[in-house]
């Protein structure tokens, strides 16, 4: 349930009287609630604020719509509560009981169907005879009692629903709390432990594999190093072999030389032996002749001995050379072996040192790899932990956001229910005031009728004229005379305040009078809820009316009549020179403008109308709205949501009002909206004024006023809406919860009113009903004495 649906249910009633009821809260230009059937005492009709010719139609009717509580035969009946037709002429009033049909009176040449129009309690009081309520007093009061009982039943039902909702909220919090803070994660512990063990085992296997790879790499490096060493040794041995091969070649050359020398010596020896044999043979041959020759000669050399000596000498030289060569070779070989051994030892020591260094490097690399692996594993573990906790944190944040959203929804529902409850309390208060007002009307009605002249017109209508025309409904007055309405009347021509006899009369919710008189120059016709007269005259509707031409049921300088939901007045008259009528939701009109409906109201030429939720006054006057409102210095009135104005101070220059939530305006004034609003300068919407709407809105400078969803106004003026309204330029209209007058007068509204500058508004035992925090006493009995 939201506020819009509740307001719709407020406009309907599931009584046993018929099938009337609203379907939805549809604020458009032609209807306020859904279609209805006939028969319901408080069922909504086709239009809550729209008339038979539209909410603010030029053609006629339609200020309050076709009915307040029902269609044909239901609620407050069809008809126009504040409707007019083109400048007050030919207008018709609204009905009160179910199926009353006709209005309470017509305006300026128009005639109403009386109190018992078609479908009502007879043919009507067309010729001016009959009482206020006639024989149907008990029926009317019983209807009001049944309405009050239905409201009390609704209040009780809403309280029960509120308690049930609170219990559901507590249960929900208990469930959500236990679900959130006692969640069991124990089934996941084993899985988490297994995953951790798997991670540790896989990490250990990876480290072992890395160590095996490092060991294999080290073994490969050792083998490669040994291979390099063997290659170096092989190259060194090859170099030694090459060096020894050179020595061997030298020795071979020497050997070949010696062999050649030996061969030459052998040949020489052979040649010598051969020569020796030849010589021996020659000598032997000579001896064979027995020739002896003796000579005394020196002895010859012994060649054999010489040869032998030479041979021995050469052999000795050869042996010596061989020995020297062998010694030299052995010496060189020993030196080379020593050098090779020393270089081998150095190489071996260097190799060992290199091997040790390589082992140390490999160990350090292995340790570095293990540390890096450990670091990466720790980083991965840290990242996994962060991701895990981030996911948990995100889940918790989502849960918190969802809970906050649910809390916000619940708070909104509770706030909406509080507003509904406050609205019901306000309705109950208004019903109490309505019952008191009815009682006072019943008690004082007969006296008012007896005090009037016999030539007074009937209750539902009165013709108006200029230059001494007829007075209001229930009395006439002209040029000093006075005409009062049922709730009051107005007088002019220097008359005095008070109801009938030249005084001033209030509307149903209040009225105003002035020293210069109201209803001047032709007087005015009042309405059941109040009215005003002017030079051309007009009559109000059930909720009120307006006047113009310098005189009205308001003040001398001008006045206004409130409507059921509100009306408007101004220094030159609200609805002046063509005038306007207020509507249940509020409306305004001026300069031949149009009357406002529940859906919207519009006015021009410096006029404004109040609204259901509030109204405004200016020019030294103040008004309060349903939720409160204030005006000053041509300021503006508040709306249901509240509003305030300035320009002479909040509540300055004569008075102030309060708003439901608060708002402000200044300069030419403005109207607040349901939640409050503000304007400044020459007014929100410009040129002196603005109009508030249920949802908020403003109009100015020929703009459009506010309806149920918006308001319209022109010429620097504004029209009120269901949620609020405002007046500017020294003009203001009353609203359902309050009203105000300005420019020397004020117009009363159903909930009350005020006037200033020589005029005051009067209500009949009416209190301004604002938001009430107290509880509704459902056990209180409401018994009405008939």
Swiss-Prot record:
The modification Phosphoserine is found at residue 52. Residues 1-21, 447-786 are annotated as: Disordered. GO terms for molecular function: structural molecule activity. The lineage of its organism: Eukaryota, Metazoa, Chordata, Craniata, Vertebrata. One of its GO terms (cellular component) is keratin filament. Residues 137-449 form the IF rod domain. Residues 192-283 are annotated as: Coil 1B. This is Keratin, type I cytoskeletal 9. Residues 446-760 are annotated as: Tail.
């Amino acid at each position: 349930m939201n506020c819009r649906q509740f307001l719709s249910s407020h406009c309907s009633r599931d009584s046993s009287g018929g099938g009337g009821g609203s379907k939805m809260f549809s604020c458009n230009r032609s209807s306020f609630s859904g279609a209805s059937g006939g028969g319901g005492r408080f069922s909504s009709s086709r239009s809550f604020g729209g008339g038979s010719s539209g909410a603010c139609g030029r053609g006629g009717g339609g200020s309050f719509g076709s009915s307040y509580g029902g269609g044909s035969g239901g609620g407050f009946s069809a008809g126009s509560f504040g409707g007019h037709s083109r400048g007050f002429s030919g207008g018709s009033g609204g009905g009160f009981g179910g199926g009353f049909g006709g209005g309470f009176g017509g305006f300026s040449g128009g005639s109403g169907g009386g109190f018992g129009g078609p479908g009502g309690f007879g043919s009507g009081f067309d010729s001016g005879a009959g009482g206020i309520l006639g024989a149907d007093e008990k029926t009317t009061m019983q209807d009001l009692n049944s309405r009050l009982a239905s409201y009390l039943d609704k209040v009780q039902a809403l309280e029960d629903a509120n308690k049930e909702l609170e219990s559901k909220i507590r249960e929900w919090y208990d469930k959500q709390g236990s679900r959130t803070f006692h969640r069991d994660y124990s089934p996941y512990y084993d899985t988490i432990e297994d995953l951790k063990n798997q991670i540790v085992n896989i990490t250990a296997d990876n480290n072992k594999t890395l160590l095996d790879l490092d060991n294999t790499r080290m073994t490969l490096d050792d083998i490669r190093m040994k291979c390099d060493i063997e290659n170096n040794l092989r190259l060194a041995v090859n170099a030694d072999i090459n060096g020894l091969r050179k020595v061997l070649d030298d020795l071979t050359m020497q050997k070949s030389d010696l062999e050649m020398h030996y061969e030459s010596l052998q040949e020489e020896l052979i040649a010598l032996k051969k020569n020796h044999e030849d010589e021996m043979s020659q000598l032997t041959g000579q001896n064979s002749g027995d020739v002896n020759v003796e000579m005394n000669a020196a002895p010859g050399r012994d060649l054999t001995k010489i040869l032998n000596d030479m041979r021995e000498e050469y052999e000795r030289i050869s042996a010596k050379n061989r020995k020297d060569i062998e010694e030299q070779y052995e010496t060189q070989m020993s030196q080379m072996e020593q050098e090779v051994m020393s270089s081998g030892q150095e190489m071996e020591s260097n190799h060992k040192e290199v091997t040790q260094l390589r082992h140390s490097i490999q160990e350090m690399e292995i340790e570095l790899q293990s540390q890096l692996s450990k670091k990466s594993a720790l980083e991965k573990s840290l990242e996994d932990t962060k991701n895990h906790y981030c996911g948990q944190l995100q889940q918790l944040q989502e849960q918190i956001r969802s809970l906050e959203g649910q809390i916000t929804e619940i708070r909104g529902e509770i706030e909406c229910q509080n507003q509904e409850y406050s609205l019901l309390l306000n309705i109950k208060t208004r019903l109490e005031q309505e019952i008191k007002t009815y009682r006072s009307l019943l008690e004082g009605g007969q006296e008012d009728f007896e005090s009037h002249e016999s030539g007074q017109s009937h209750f539902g209508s009165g013709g108006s004229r200029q230059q001494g025309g007829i007075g209001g409904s229930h009395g006439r007055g002209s040029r000093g005379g006075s005409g009062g309405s049922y709730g009051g009347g107005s007088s002019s021509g220097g008359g005095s305040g008070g109801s009938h006899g030249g005084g001033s009369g209030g509307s149903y919710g209040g009225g105003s009078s002035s020293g210069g008189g109201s209803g001047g120059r032709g007087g005015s016709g009042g309405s059941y809820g109040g009215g005003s007269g002017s030079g051309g005259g007009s009559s109000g509707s059930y909720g009120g009316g307006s006047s113009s031409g310098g005189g009205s049921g308001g003040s001398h300088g001008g006045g206004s009549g409130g409507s059921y939901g509100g009306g408007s007045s101004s220094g030159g008259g609200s609805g002046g020179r063509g005038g306007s009528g207020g509507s249940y939701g509020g409306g305004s009109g001026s300069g031949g403008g149009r009357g406002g409906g529940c859906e919207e109201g519009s006015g021009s030429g410096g006029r404004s109308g109040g609204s259901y939720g509030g109204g405004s006054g200016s020019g030294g006057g103040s008004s309060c709205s349903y939720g409160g409102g204030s005006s000053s210095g041509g300021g503006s009135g508040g709306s249901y949501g509240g509003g305030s104005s300035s320009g002479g101070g909040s509540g300055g220059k004569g008075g102030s009002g309060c708003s439901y939530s608060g708002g402000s305006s200044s300069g030419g004034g403005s109207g607040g909206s349901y939640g409050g609003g503000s304007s400044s300068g020459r007014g929100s919407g410009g040129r002196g004024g603005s109009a508030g709407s249920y949802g908020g809105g403003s109009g100015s400078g020929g703009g459009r006023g506010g309806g149920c969803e918006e308001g319209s106004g022109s010429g620097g003026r504004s029209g009120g809406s269901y949620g609020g309204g405002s007046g500017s330029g020294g003009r203001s209209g009353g609203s359902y919860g309050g009203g105000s007058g300005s420019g020397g007068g004020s117009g009363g509204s159903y909930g009350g009113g005020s006037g200033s500058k020589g005029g005051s508004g009067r209500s009949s035992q009416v209190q301004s009903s604002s938001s009430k925090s107290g509880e509704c006493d459902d056990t209180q009995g409401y018994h009405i004495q008939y």
